[in-house]
Design a protein with these regions (language model features):
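Activation-segment/catalytic-loop signature of the eukaryotic protein kinase fold
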Residues: 1-102
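Low-complexity, flexible helical/coil segments
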Residues: 37-41, 103-108, 127-131
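Generic detection of intrinsically disordered/low-complexity segments and helix-coil linkers/edges
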Residues: 8, 18, 41, 73, ...
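Short, hydrophobic alpha-helical segments
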Residues: 53, 108-114
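Acidic, glycine/GT-rich loop-and beta-edge segments that sit at the periphery of enzyme/chaperone cores
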Residues: 113-174
Length: 174
């Protein structure tokens, strides 16, 4: 099953196709039930993350050797593994998963002079509760699925542009 939800950011043309689950099979509840839908959503989010990573690499030349997955998404086991497999790099779950709140507190502490600078706290922030290593066979399969997802999304946008489907969202002027 393939979920079509969010698209990659594109400042020249930012639009999202009509949300869809493709290859949904009413005759096979195991392949199209709740678990399959959740997995398809998590895979679609991982494809968007991969696309954004690729854009950053293309623009800056920087590559990523690891990813840190924070927040509620890091509490499960499936989504971090999907991310590791789609991105092809280890995904780490930090001990403190609420990184936004922690970052704000650290910046406030540095601003108030509690810490000499932000780097002072770096060693304590590297504690991790789990690491998900990419499975090479899964990564190879996801490479093919990602290419298919990109092409399907491109065609879904064409259908949307032709007025056959309503977009999920379209930026003003797009």
């Amino acid at each position: 099953m393939i979920a079509i939800l969010s698209n990659l950011m594109n400042a020249k043309r930012w639009a999202h196709a009509s949300p869809s689950f493709l290859q949904f099979d009413l005759g096979d509840p195991a392949a199209s039930g709740r678990g399959a839908c959740v997995r398809a959503i998590e895979e679609a989010a991982a494809y968007v993350a991969r696309g954004h990573r690729d854009i950053i690499t293309e623009l800056t030349g920087l590559t990523f050797s690891e990813v840190i997955f924070t927040g509620g998404a890091g509490r499960g086991r499936l989504w971090p593994q999907i991310m590791a497999d789609v991105l092809g790099v280890p995904v780490h779950i930090p001990a403190v998963t609420e990184s936004s709140a922690l970052g704000a507190a650290i910046c406030a502490g540095a601003g108030a002079g509690v810490y000499s600078d932000l780097l002072e706290l770096r060693p304590g922030l590297r504690r991790r509760t789990a690491t998900f290593e990419p499975d090479q066979a899964a990564t190879a399969a996801y490479d093919e699925q990602y290419a298919a997802w990109r092409e399907i999304y491109r065609r879904m946008l064409e259908i949307t542009d032709d007025g056959l489907l309503n977009p999920l969202w379209r930026a003003a002027g797009a």
